[in-house]
Design a protein with these regions (language model features):
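Bacterial N-terminal signal peptides
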Residues: 13-22
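Pepsin/retropepsin-fold aspartyl endopeptidases
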Residues: 2, 7, 23-325
Length: 325
């Protein structure tokens, strides 16, 4: 049965950085390439994903027998469907007498709720159920930033990913969804045999997911966000940690609707858990307050898609771990 959390508020932040991928072009991901056959794992269904030109992790799906494209987004607390495309996908808003409620309250904004008779991705059958219908022209900049510019139909968010104990292999471009109650993928055992570093993944009060990190020996946490195509530090915090950045002409349009300048700098001493990140150029900007305000967590920035893939990242929502090598 497909369900969605319709009352939980989440931070949802991603920046759209025009030109940043060109400046950091060595970190861009190939959109399409030949892939190995999908593995067969008892108790799990493997679904292929691919990267778009903007490093978004895309999953091909079928909604009510109609083909659709979804962004796989660990930074989105809930899954949504573009209201403008709902009709062509055979999805209509539910009525006032619906047991799921006529409206969903997401990020303080009310959205109509639609009912999906079926949602499938590859061999994975998510079943039927309600999903919030997002209006891109609405005032919710957070969602608008995430479902914009890639011709996608919606977002597969943390509600579905955590419900099915998803294991996201960012390097092999495969997502495993758990369908059996007793089987376990034992990612940690495999990762240890392949010299991966295991990093604990923590859910914050806002339903953001973070990992421990350090910059020049200063402890912080990074938001794990497959919806962010570029790793971006909070500029003030990075400077506080002794990292120098050079201003550029580029700007970023953030989830709070404010456009900010983007800086780039050489980061030589970044550790994520026990994993030492190779020295490289990374971006920084003044991140929105709701991105860095995660209760007691001291957020240093957003861990984006390019670094997750380059580090052979595996995100395991079963053991609540991230693995790098």
């Amino acid at each position: 049965m497909l369900k969605i959390l319709v009352n939980r508020k989440t931070f949802l932040t991603i920046l759209i950085l025009t030109g940043t991928i060109l400046l950091l072009s060595d970190r861009a991901l190939p959109a399409k390439e030949r892939r190995a056959p999908l593995p067969s794992v008892p108790g799990y269904v493997a679904v292929p994903v691919h990267y778009s030109h903007w490093n978004k992790m895309m999953m091909e799906a079928v909604v009510n027998v109609h083909r659709a494209r979804f962004v796989v987004d660990t930074g989105a607390g809930y899954s949504i469907l573009d209201a403008g495309r709902a009709h062509s996908l055979g999805v209509s808003p539910v009525g006032a007498d619906s047991p799921y409620g006529e409206f969903a309250n997401l990020n303080g904004v009310r959205y109509r709720v639609g009912y999906l008779n079926s949602l499938r991705a590859g061999a994975m059958d998510f079943g039927s159920g309600p999903m919030a219908l997002f209006q891109p022209a609405s005032e919710d900049a957070a969602l608008n930033a995430r479902i914009n510019g890639e011709n996608e139909d919606g977002i597969i968010g943390a509600d579905i990913l955590t419900r099915y104990k998803a294991v996201i292999n960012c390097y092999t471009k495969t997502v495993f969804f758990k369908t059996g109650s007793s089987e376990q993928l034992h990612v940690a055992r495999f990762a240890a045999s392949q010299n991966f570093k295991r990093i604990p993944l923590r859910e914050e009060v806002s339903r953001a997911f973070t990992v421990p990190a350090s910059i020049n020996g200063h402890s912080c946490r990074l938001l794990v966000d497959t919806g962010a195509f570029i790793t971006t530090f909070d500029l003030s915090r990075a400077k506080e940690f002794g990292v120098s950045f050079t201003n550029t002409r580029m700007s970023g349009s953030f989830a709070d609707g404010i456009t900010r300048r983007v800086a780039v700098g050489n980061v030589a001493n970044l550790k994520i858990g026990d994993y030492q990140v190779p020295p490289q150029r990374l971006a920084a900007s003044v991140l929105p307050d709701f991105a860095v305000d995660q209760g007691q967590a001291k957020i240093g920035g957003i861990l984006g898609m390019e670094l997750l893939a380059a580090s052979h990242g595996i995100i395991d929502f079963d053991s609540m771990s991230v693995f790098f090598k």
